[in-house]
């Protein structure tokens, strides 16, 4: 089997794409990977070095949600059609909506892991109510582009039933819809290290959908480390330190710069608690990584987290900093409860969110789509 996969190098979905591609290749699938966005840095592609059976084609085409993306989208469509004609893959797997309507006689899978309309629905205060006419036209054009891709794809895959329902409500119900939960390879994470009394969170403070600022609104009884932040917010109520160490001798909030994957895995392994504060989290890869590292999960009470983690996480009242602080205090005071939640998260990740399970489900979908296309020929 030969699968042509597209991905983007600018978001956290690149980790998902890597898991998908690596998992397919190790199962004997030939993969051609086309990346959009920026040409990746060497650190972003080092995982490909010993992956035999992968043909990588980097491009700098804009992503469909970017300003002035329409011209790039047309050029990228021509490029993909030419590549499909040259390589004749068995399946096209797109991580962009717009190429779901590519006019080729090959099964097209679209992965719906996030979009502008459902993001704006979840984070309404992060964009102005009054939109300039040019922006309204761009918004309408974006919606129409995404709708066409969803409506004409042979299958649309979402990482959760919640995401699938939101996409269907915002655009249209796909002809064929599948929920395939994301996966990570547990071999990359260490769940056996002695834990430090600390809280870890991953994301940018300026990203309203991550709302990591909730962690700055109260003083906590143990250190908190936010990784990947590019700048602090104005006047946090909790004193901020700027280093990369998780545990400290004094209670504080540490703002860490971007970390390498090895550094981040070490932080996961040492952190006792992971704070999943997002109000919009369609993919949720950082939470998977924390769970595979046996962190206790404190999660914002949103439908996506409830679906993914069930009783394996401790939830705080939706978007409420005081409730988050109370949950942190609870797990700090009750070590047995903290260990129990860590075990629950680890067990749920091992049971439901491995790369192997994800690849099994994708291969089943691919084979079914190929069979349907062959029978119709």
Language model features with spans:
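Acceptor-binding helix/loop patch of EC 2.4 sugar-transfer enzymes
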Residues: 110-147
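Nucleotide-activated donor-binding/catalytic signature segment of Leloir-type glycosyltransferases, i.e.
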Residues: 237-262
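Short alpha-helical donor nucleotide-sugar binding micro-motif in glycosyltransferases
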Residues: 266-271
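Conserved donor-binding/catalytic core segment of Leloir-type glycosyltransferases
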Residues: 193-227
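Conserved acidic donor-binding segment of nucleotide-sugar-dependent glycosyltransferases
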Residues: 313-321, 330-336
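Short hydrophobic beta-strand element within catalytic cores of glycosyltransferases
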Residues: 296-299
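Helix-loop-beta element that forms the nucleotide-linked donor phosphate-binding surface
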Residues: 151-152, 158, 164-184, 192
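Aromatic "clamp/platform" in nucleotide-sugar-dependent glycosyltransferases that forms part
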Residues: 279
């Amino acid at each position: 089997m030969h699968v042509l996969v597209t991905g983007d190098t600018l978001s956290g979905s690149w980790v998902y794409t890597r898991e998908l591609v690596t998992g397919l290749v190790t199962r004997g699938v030939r993969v051609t990977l086309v990346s959009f966005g920026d040409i990746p840095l060497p650190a972003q592609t080092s995982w490909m070095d010993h992956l035999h059976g992968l043909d990588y084609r980097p491009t700098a085409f804009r992503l469909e949600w970017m300003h002035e993306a329409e011209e790039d989208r047309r050029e990228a469509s021509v490029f993909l059609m030419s590549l499909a004609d040259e390589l004749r893959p068995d399946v096209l797997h797109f991580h962009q909506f717009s190429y779901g309507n590519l006019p080729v006689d090959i099964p097209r899978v679209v992965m719906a892991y996030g979009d502008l309309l459902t993001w704006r629905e979840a984070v309404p205060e992060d964009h102005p109510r009054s939109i300039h006419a040019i922006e309204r036209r761009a918004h309408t054009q974006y919606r129409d582009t995404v709708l066409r891709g969803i409506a004409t794809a042979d299958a649309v895959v979402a990482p959760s039933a919640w995401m699938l329902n939101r996409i269907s409500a915002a655009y249209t119900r796909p002809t064929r819809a599948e929920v395939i939960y994301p996966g990570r390879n547990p071999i990359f994470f260490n769940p056996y290290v002695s834990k430090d009394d600390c809280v870890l969170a991953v994301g940018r403070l300026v990203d309203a959908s991550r709302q990591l600022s909730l962690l700055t609104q109260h003083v906590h009884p143990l250190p908190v480390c936010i990784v990947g932040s590019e700048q602090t917010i104005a006047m946090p109520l909790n004193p901020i330190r700027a280093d990369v160490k998780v545990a400290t001798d004094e209670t504080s909030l540490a703002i860490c710069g971007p970390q390498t994957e090895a550094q981040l895995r070490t932080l996961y392994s040492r952190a006792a608690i992971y704070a999943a504060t997002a109000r919009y989290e369609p993919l949720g890869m950082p939470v998977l990584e924390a769970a595979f590292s046996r962190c206790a999960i404190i999660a914002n009470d949103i439908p996506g987290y409830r679906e993914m983690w069930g009783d394996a996480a401790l939830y705080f009242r939706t978007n409420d900093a005081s409730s988050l602080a109370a949950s942190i205090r609870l797990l700090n005071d009750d070590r047995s409860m903290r260990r129990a939640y860590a075990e629950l998260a680890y067990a749920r990740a091992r049971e439901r969110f491995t790369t192997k399970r994800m690849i099994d489900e994708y291969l089943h979908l691919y084979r079914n789509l190929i069979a349907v296309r062959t029978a119709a020929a």
